[in-house]
Amino acid sequence: MEKFIHNNILFAIIVRNDFHREGINFATDGKQSLEMAYMSHPAGHIIKPHRHVPLKRVTHNTQEVLFLKSGKLRIDIYSDDNIRIGSRELVGGDWIMLLDGGHGFEILEPSVLFEV
């Protein structure tokens, strides 16, 4: 998992399609309005019924998760004053959670995306 940090601000979290670790691996730390985790369990593993503790959360912007099902794109990440602070290429199977700042895309190959 790659955390895109600029000036001590977490802008994005990227999970690559070839990432693999056993068990539950949280990408987020509980400070974000969404929880994102990678899970890998063997057949027969049971995740017990559970509920999340109610929390009052204040959001100052829309956070989103994008899953690139297929294709290839470049995402540009921008600061709040619209200055490009970095770019990353994503390929089919990659995930990105956008937490702060702005973003734009260039589609490099025909692509299918899901946005949450």
What are these model-predicted stretches?
Residues 49, 75-76, 96-98, 103-108, ...:
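Short beta-strand His + acidic residue motifs that chelate non-heme Fe in jelly-roll/DSBH
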Residues 79-100:
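Short acidic-glycine-tyrosine-enriched beta hairpin
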Residues 42-43, 61-78:
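Glycine- and acidic-residue-biased ligand/ion/polar-headgroup-sensing regions
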Residues 1-38:
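A short, N-terminal "cap"/entry segment at the start of jelly-roll beta-barrel domains
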Residues 38, 65, 110-116:
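A short hydrophobic beta-strand segment most commonly corresponding to one strand
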Residues 42, 68, 91, 98-99, ...:
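A short, compositionally biased micro-patch
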Residues 55-56, 81-83, 112:
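Short, surface-exposed beta-strand-loop junctions and turns on beta-sheet-rich folds
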Residues 38-60:
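Conserved short histidine dyad/triad with adjacent acidic residue
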